[in-house]
């Protein structure tokens, strides 16, 4: 990707004598020399190989490195003694990112959401199934919000009955748990190129769920997806 400022104006500027044509030749020559060193004149599609891609795309080494980077990049904002989690206690995972595969973020056009590991999928490998429950609670954004991306627009709309059932299930799980982990945050279409926000807050539908969960169980850990 590049700006169109050069393509749109250089010809005119050369004709008007504002830009020396030799300067353009020098710049083009540097690009051609680099391409020659890379062997692109002999093989313009160098390394663009579907079979080679399979060897390193999502390979164990790369996934392990990505996991390590994620583990070491967490920022703890506050802890009132709830963390680290006591695996002997009953834990409820409540929130729209509990089992949400749409966590690739922007500029992941060739990625497949099914390859993303959700919090629930990871937790099921660590915690005792008899002491953990999972509930979505609410969608990432409410029906009153429409988001527009490069290839998609409006997220799924939920009926009032669906929203009520999701919330009821989440609150019941929160009541019965010793502590609650709430994975929540902004929609992936709210982050990235051309998505500046006037208010960088958590969507209100999630905040409503958070307040209701807090009312039935004060032991809450929030995991923000931003």
Label the predicted regions.
Residues 3-21, 33-34, 56, 64-226:
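C-terminal non-catalytic regions of proteins with extracellular/luminal or membrane-system context
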Residues 29, 33-52:
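Conserved, charged catalytic cores of large soluble enzymes
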Residues 51-60:
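Short glycine/proline- and acidic residue-enriched helix-loop micro-motifs
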């Amino acid at each position: 990707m590049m700006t169109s400022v050069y393509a749109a104006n250089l010809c005119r500027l050369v004709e008007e004598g504002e830009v020396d044509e030799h300067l353009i030749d020098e710049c083009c020559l540097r690009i051609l020399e680099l391409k020659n060193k890379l062997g692109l004149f002999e093989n313009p599609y160098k390394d663009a190989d579907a079979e080679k891609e399979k060897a390193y795309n999502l390979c164990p080494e790369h996934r392990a490195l990505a996991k390590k980077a994620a583990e070491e990049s967490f920022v703890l904002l506050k802890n009132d003694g709830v963390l680290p989690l006591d695996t002997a206690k009953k834990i409820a995972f409540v929130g729209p990112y509990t089992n949400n595969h749409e966590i690739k973020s922007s500029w992941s056009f060739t990625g497949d959401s099914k390859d993303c590991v959700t919090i629930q999928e990871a937790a099921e490998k660590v915690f005792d199934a008899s002491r953990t429950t999972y509930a979505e609670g609410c969608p990432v954004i409410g029906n009153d919000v429409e988001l527009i991306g490069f290839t998609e627009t409006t997220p799924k709309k939920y009926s009032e009955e669906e929203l009520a059932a999701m919330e009821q299930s989440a609150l019941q799980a929160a009541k019965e748990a010793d502590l609650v982990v709430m994975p929540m945050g902004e929609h992936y279409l709210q982050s990235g190129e051309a998505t500046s926000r006037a208010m960088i807050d958590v969507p209100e539908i999630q905040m409503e769920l958070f307040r209701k969960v807090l009312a039935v169980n004060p032991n809450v850990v929030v995991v923000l997806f931003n």
